[in-house]
Structures are given as C-alpha cells and as structure tokens.
Amino acid sequence: MRKTHYIPVTADVPGAASDANCALISRTIRTALAAEGVTAPCEVDVLLTDDEGIHRINLDMRQVDRPTDVLSFPEFDLAPGEHPGPEDADPGTGLIPLGDMVLSMERVAAQAKEFGHSRRRELAYLVTHSVLHLLGYDHLDEGPMKEQMRAREEAVMALLGLER
C-alpha cells in the first residue's frame, strides 16, 4: 500500500514528458493537494498531448469540437473544498483515484507567450487549475465560484514561487 501520492505522467507527443516537466507536474499536484488539505494518498493520471490530441478527447468526452488547454475528469462529484475519504481508496493500492488530467503542450507554449510568462509558470498554472477541478471547484459562472477558484490558484502558485 502506497503512503504517498502516485502521479503517472504519459505523453503522446515527443519530448513532452521530460524529466523537468514531470518533476514540475508532480510538485504542483502535491502542492495543490496539500494546500487544499488533502492528506490521504491519491492517484492523479496525467496525459501530455498536443492541440490535435486534446481536440479529439474534448470532442469524444464533452462533445466540444475544438482544442483547449486542459481537461479534467474527476472521479468524484465533490463540492469545492470537499475531499474524498479513506473509504474511497482503491482496496488494492490504498490510493484515492482523484481523476485524470489532459494538457495540451501546444497551448502551454502559446499561452505562456500570450501572457508574457514562462512555459514553466503556464504548465504549473494549468496543472493547479486541473487539480482544483478534480476537487470540485468550478468557474462556469463569472461570480463567487470563479473568484474562489482563482484565489485558490493564486495561493498555490505563490507556494510554488510562481506568482505573477
């Protein structure tokens, strides 16, 4: 039984799963989970792809016919700030399967350029954003829920030393 988070990162584009990217993704997920008070060992599966790959997944899973920067597929229907409990752990591994995230590395590069910051910061931001979705946060409205999610994202980015 694992006592730490398990974060497998796979890629279907060459070079995306570099040691540096995998280390940043793992550190970001661990930091975001800790910031949200998640102490039980969790599994988060990460796929790094390109615009074509994420477009295909977006169409298949959400019937949205366009690429996006990040997709999150939570295992649980949680309210913001709610955590799955030990009873949700896989009996074989002892891990709580939080869900999956898919990131377009093309969007990471384009958005980093657009927003005038590093790819490293953009990747960490999108990973943080996805973790919060896995934990029940959302931003469908332009009101308090979106503000709450943005505040949590900025808090995690500050912990990572990657604030704006």
State each model region's role.
Residues 1-124, 132-164:
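An acidic/histidine-cluster motif and surrounding catalytic segment
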